[in-house]
Amino acid sequence: MLDRIGYLHGLHDSSRVAQPEHMLDSPEVDMKTLRGKVWKYGSDINTDVIIPGRYCHITEPKELAKYCMADLDPEFVNKMAPGDIIVAGPNFGCGSSREVAPLSIKATGTAAVVAPSFARIFYRNAINIGFPIFESSEAYEQVDEGDEVEIDPDAGEIRNLTKGDTFKSAPFPEFVQEIIAKGGLARYAEERLAAG
């Protein structure tokens, strides 16, 4: 995770920010506590499955959300409630570089994704659009679909409220928490530039 954070830190230079205008409309995220029902998926969930290529031309997040996981789980958008959490296996978000992959998940109202590991480009894209992701092998191994979990980003804790278990996840550095809380890198950079 540290090398990913270090790599992200290079994007702290707002002159290198390039995002579509609609990304500025990404809502801010309350990073105090995330709580929701778990929907569980396997390993190597790639971006082509998260949002199939035939829908990548869609730029409106709410429209894009309608097709999230369409080929993997056709009922995904119908069963997800705002605040629900995806728990998946290792290498989540592998495959082609699609910023629309984490955007489509975020636009469904999903609060976060928890996985043992994320593909590096998905990891960066998720942070860039202000979507919280957490690494925890224990959570993946011990949380079941339907469990209710609570995530404390500051403490780096994932609590399974159904079973009473607590798992660790490395907390984000403060600047990454700020990017997520602002709704993404574009808004974060815009506000930093405006502040001088």
Language-model region placement:
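Conserved phosphate/anionic-ligand binding catalytic regions in large, soluble enzymes, centered on
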Residues: 45, 93-99, 180-190
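Alpha-helical scaffold segments in soluble metabolic enzymes
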Residues: 49, 63, 67, 125, ...
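Short, low-complexity, charge-dense intrinsically disordered segments
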Residues: 9-19
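N-terminal, positively charged, Ser/Thr/Ala/Gly-biased leader segments
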Residues: 3-6, 23-52, 187-196
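N-terminal, intrinsically disordered, basic low-complexity segments enriched in Arg/Pro/Ser/Thr
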Residues: 17-21, 30, 76
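C-terminal binding/interaction regions
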Residues: 146-189
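Feature captures the catalytic cores and cofactor-binding loops of soluble hydro-lyases/lyases
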Residues: 51-52, 56-155, 164
